[in-house]
Amino acid sequence: MLRQVLRRSLSDSRRPLRSVGSISCSARASGIGMRAYSSQIFKEGMQLETHTDIQSAAREQAQERMGSEALASNNSVLKHAYQESVDHGTRPIYLDMQATTPTDPRVVDTMLKFYTGLYGNPHSNTHSYGWETSQEVEKARKNVADVIKADPKEIIFTSGATESNNMALKGVARFYKKRKNHIITTRTEHKCVLEAARSMKDEGFDVTFLNVNEDGLVSLEELEQAIRPETSLVSVMSVNNEIGVVQPIKEIGAICRRHKVFFHSDAAQAYGKIPIDVDEMNIDLLSISSHKIYGPKGIGALYVRRRPRVRMEPLLSGGGQERGFRSGTLPPPLVVGLGHAAKLMVEEYEYDSAHVRRLSDRLLKGLLSIEQTTLNGSADHRYPGCVNVSFAFVEGESLLMALRDIALSSGSACTSASLEPSYVLHAIGRDDALAHSSIRFGIGRFTTEAEVDYVIKAITERVEFLRELSPLWEMYKDGIDLNTIEWSGH
């Protein structure tokens, strides 16, 4: 099967890297393979190489800088992991799918011709170069719309979900500000939504930030009570990027429609991964990200309902492209890449969903078998590809350092540069200790069963090792109730 070949190619972390001067997408074929694409034939046994000399140099520098410390460790597990991931030049297992996904080689293949022969400006309507690229852009627009059962005319291409979210919140709020100046969102939204909402407060808007329960779900009753006559917009994300909780989008949409309030949802983590029907769910605006669905980075979209029409004030001034909402020349390679990625999400939805759920169940069962581990967020209303677990008595950052052979994100930071506990985990009632001990695992199309088994084994060993260094773990094992201890500060 082609997807099995692609999965082995993209996620085989045991494969050594070869240094090349530039990024290459070369296939070495052996055995049998039958499916052809426009510029490459993918066959059984192909290997995809996507590294550069820069990565090789960075790896060598990391080895020089950290090698002595890592090799000095008496712990064989950590040393073995370090040596495999650095000394022998193998890539870590990638389980950070909520941050980004690998670009599907079939998507890359579709994009290539737009960097060579089909390089026309899609907005040039006086010659064939513009006509042909415009035609391909509109095909991509239809593919993007089909995922959410929308009209292609309702899809506005943007640079990504951050721009889409800002466009939705700021554009709607500013257009209706003379009659309505109230916005509702939740405390667990993505940073770009929270910051956009806060910037609206600086402009004089009133913003309500709704709490969520311990499962990470918003209360429908509290939402309805928060709506006022002057409320213009409600923004609630479909799937949370940290804990994978799926909000009751259909019910929220019904409430908003009943009160004649526009409903926006950040679907960066949901688009193509859970069923979405914008009409059935009464969604008026929906943000889309390409690189979360195995498409290229730097492109996204915003669904904007036409009936009843949603009006927005544009963020950018210019030539009035994209129905006047988003001026600027579209990048055909990226747009077509997003379109093909969306098409694949539809075609392979059943397979991908079953694959992700099976591996997620396997991973979660293995992780929760470790003593004193907790799943963060709802167990029932959750996208399976996002698994967030707290390991008590272990610092999440320390665990990540011990897992150099696995690419993961810590649930203890809302951004990679921050050392503050996750605001999402705080919102669902986790204390600082548990928030700091959380790790997010992302499973996707190219994740393999062997990788999941390796991760379970590695996590189990290294959590045990780090806990042996913790005095609190020793006290817990001795039966001491840590909640009864009065800690003194100095």
UniProtKB/Swiss-Prot annotation:
GO terms (molecular function) for this protein are: cysteine desulfurase activity; iron-sulfur cluster binding; metal ion binding; pyridoxal phosphate binding
Leader peptide range in chain numbering: none
Where in the cell does this protein reside? Answer: Mitochondrion
Q: Which cofactor does it need?
A: pyridoxal 5'-phosphate
Gene3D superfamilies to which the protein is assigned, alphabetical: Aspartate Aminotransferase, domain 1, Type I PLP-dependent aspartate aminotransferase-like (Major domain)
Catalytic residues in the record? C414 (cysteine persulfide intermediate)
Binding residues for [2Fe-2S] cluster, per the UniProt record? C414
Q: EC number(s) of the enzyme?
A: 2.8.1.7
Q: Which domain of life is it from?
A: Eukaryota
Q: What keywords tag this UniProt record? A: Iron, Iron-sulfur, Metal-binding, Mitochondrion, Pyridoxal phosphate, Transferase, Transit peptide
Q: Cellular component per GO?
A: cytosol; L-cysteine desulfurase complex; mitochondrion; nucleus
Q: Which residues bind pyridoxal 5'-phosphate?
A: A161, T162, N241, Q269, S289, S290, H291, T329
Please tell me where this protein is predominantly located: mitochondrion
Keyword Transcription in record:
no
Give one GO biological process term: tRNA wobble position uridine thiolation
Q: Which residues carry this modification: N6-(pyridoxal phosphate)lysine?
A: K292
From the UniProt record, list the reaction(s) this protein catalyses: (sulfur carrier)-H + L-cysteine = (sulfur carrier)-SH + L-alanine
> Sorted alphabetically, which Pfam families does this protein's record hold?
Aminotran_5
Q: Family per UniProt?
A: Belongs to the class-V pyridoxal-phosphate-dependent aminotransferase family. NifS/IscS subfamily.
PANTHER family assigned to the protein according to its UniProt record, in alphabetical order: CYSTEINE DESULFURASE (PTHR11601:SF34), CYSTEINE DESULFURYLASE FAMILY MEMBER (PTHR11601)
Q: What function does the entry list?
A: Catalyzes the removal of elemental sulfur from cysteine to produce alanine. It supplies the inorganic sulfur for iron-sulfur (Fe-S) clusters. Plays a role in both tRNA-processing and mitochondrial metabolism. Involved in the 2-thio-modification of both 5-carboxymethylaminomethyl-2-thiouridine in mitochondrial tRNAs and 5-methoxycarbonylmethyl-2-thiouridine (mcm5s2U) in cytoplasmic tRNAs.
Q: List the protein's name.
A: Cysteine desulfurase, mitochondrial
| Gene it is expressed from | NFS1
